[in-house]
């Protein structure tokens, strides 16, 4: 669900049992591909729309960005860390100036988190990114292929 739809109808959708997700869709919308920025924008825009500083629920937005997104993509086995579930996770460095002081970890992540805080990502138990480096991935080849596709569809 895009941030505008989530902002406009979030409560109604939740009451109807519709799972909400947070995502990015590339250069056509904002070019950042930054989930932290998306969560922040949803919360801030919700507050502005409702003219109420308490309108946004950081817990609900974080849940939509994690478990909600997994469910919406048809991956209920990736919605939490538990035996028998996929080991998909992100390790965040909390010992950075933008994450201090820690009063409420969820609010810190949603309002202050940044992609530069990511130290590790794991997908299905395999570490794909660690300390600023993609492992076992030729990023230059990926960039080249992406540009080829863009050039072809332009």
Indicate where each model-derived feature is located:
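Short, small-residue-biased leader/transition segments that mark boundaries at the very start
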Residues: 1-7
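Conserved catalytic motifs of the protein kinase core domain
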Residues: 2, 19, 118
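Flexible loop/turn segments at secondary-structure boundaries
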Residues: 3, 29-32, 98-99, 129
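Charged helix-capping and loop-helix junction motifs
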Residues: 8-11, 106
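His/Asp/Glu-enriched, well-ordered alpha-helical/loop segment
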Residues: 11-96, 112-114
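Active-site microenvironment of metallo-dependent hydrolases
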Residues: 63-154
């Amino acid at each position: 669900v895009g941030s505008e739809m989530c902002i406009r109808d979030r409560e109604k959708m939740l009451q109807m049992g519709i799972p909400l997700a947070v995502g990015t869709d590339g250069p056509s919308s904002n070019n950042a591909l930054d989930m932290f920025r998306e969560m922040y924008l949803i919360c801030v825009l919700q507050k502005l729309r409702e003219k109420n500083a308490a309108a946004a629920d950081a817990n609900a937005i974080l849940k939509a960005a994690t478990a909600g997104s997994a469910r919406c993509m048809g991956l209920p086995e990736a919605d939490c860390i538990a035996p028998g579930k996929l080991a998909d996770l992100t390790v965040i460095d909390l010992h950075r100036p933008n994450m201090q002081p820690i009063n409420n970890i969820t609010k810190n992540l949603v309002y202050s988190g940044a992609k530069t805080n990511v130290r590790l990502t794991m997908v299905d138990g395999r570490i794909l990114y660690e300390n600023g480096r993609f492992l076992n991935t030729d990023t230059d080849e990926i960039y080249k292929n992406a540009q080829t596709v863009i050039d072809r569809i332009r």
